[in-house]
Amino acid sequence: MLTFTSRWCVVCLTPAAAALALAGAMAQQPVPTAPAAAPAVPPTWAQGRKPEQESLNLAPHPPGITALAPEEIPLDRIKLPEGFRIAVWASGLPNARSMTFGRNGTLFVGTRFVGSVYAVVDKGTAREVKTLLKGLHRPNGLAFKNGALYVAEVSRILRYDSIESRLDSPPEPVVVFDALPKDEAHGWKFMTLGPDGWLYFQIGSPGNILIPPVTHAQIARVDPERGVLETVVSGVRNSVGMDFHPVTRELWFTNNGRDWMGEDVPNDTLHRVTHKGMNFGFPFCHQGDLLDDEFGKGRSCQEFDAPALKLGPHVAPLGMRFYTGRQFPAEYRNNIFIAEHGSWNRTRKQGFNVSRVVLDGDGRPVKYEPFATGFLQAETFWGRPVDVQVAPDGALLVSDDVAGAIYRISYGK
Amino acid sequence: MQRGPILRVFVAARLAVLAAAVIQGHPAMGADAAAGKAKSEACAACHGPDGNSTNPLIPSLAGQTPLYIYYQLVQFREQRRVNELMSPFAAKLTDADMKDIAAYYSGQKAAEPALPADDPRYEAGKAVVAGNHCGSCHLPTLTGQQQIPRIAGLQYDYLVKQLRGFKTGERPDIDGSMASAAQPLSDKDITDVSLYLAGLR
């Protein structure tokens, strides 16, 4: 997996090679010229772990690869503000992750660990769940444009034309772009369609904390008509959620901070992109004001652009959307909802919520609060929010990759 | 250097503590090991009645982490891990069946492995484990955690086949960690480390 396709990558370093080069430079020694094989690196999640942290027994939670039956989903544990309620909208979707709506109302749901893409068809009182695509390589990123479903795997973007009329016999995909890095580490994509018609997604850092190749740790975009790829912003460790402000059309995104620097640092963050070419600091500066304890030496956070909001340490903010519906009270209009998958690199768990961010007239966050809580009960979680999506009727859908379900949060009646 | 009996007892005790913690700690373990024993009759022909396989290419399940057994059964059922022997069995199992079977086998005692006698590859295999950070996920005892399998004491031939499979991509893995980890391994590394692991309890 440590190989790169170099169609657009000019300076390609594998993570192993980058680590080797770095280690060589730090030791003031020449880099070995012809190693028998690339040296092994620790698994992504363990990179940067200090020896004294091993006894904490912290490791990423097992992925959800099955689905709970609807009657097994303890939604009575969920707490919401007054007037809101939550119900199971669809179940039986193992590892349900990113969501996007088709023009005719089909909800498409991607996965990270099971290779499938689901299509959920609303039949009024019930939903029909179809396994639309199988055997894909981490099809976590989805977008819909001109009747076609776009699917981002780790290294390719695929297009399925006229998909909503072919849910039972999807066509062979057209490969739109196939030259993205193949790293497994932070290699799965979140993808969304920009108002400019380009597909936006992240290329994550190929490790917890390292000097990334110039091809990585960024938000990128592809013009699906021409197959052109561009960097939008850099210094982004791994974003698994983004959306465009409905009024300003600026890109906003969530970012997952590094692990093993501490229980309470760094914060995960919410970012506002005011212009192309911004650099948000990874791996030198985290959360806009905290130098990395290793890579920050000799650097300053002033060199970089700051996040719009700190979200808390290790909360794992994934999908985010602006609330553009009309069902919720007026004060929710153009708020940001964020699905927080929840922490693993922290002895007391944090996150496991859907949270709400209120912006003022200048687009500055003025309030950040939990919106849907209760996935975590006394340090044990039964579900993990992954993505949020505003339904055509103004309800908020939430995907859960542990329960394998989609919930609907509605207001009134 | 061969391990003395004291170290072996220490390792076994630590393993038991870890296994207990893992079983109690996971929500999957509303499972019923007694029911799992009854449901595992078909498994016993190949994996052994107590989960200690005598077939070099069929893995022992005794003392395996319950979540690993459960996840692999799901993978077989969903055809994401394909094996002509396993797939038909897994196809018939519900999630609850799989959790019960996993609970049963994880609670069985792993048989004493046949230790290699002064095999020079033993130390080489130990160095492969250290140099490739196997203990990061499989734990320093190599007894696994959560969905990460116990690899200590598995059969040599089975380990070699799986590691070669991870390297070529023939053996899929859920999150890609093993595909990445197997890339730097030479075939000698694979046989050395398999020999070392097969001798661990």
Q: What is the meaning of each model-derived region?
A:
Chain A
Residues 32-81, 188, 206-208, 214-217, ...:
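Beta-propeller domain segments
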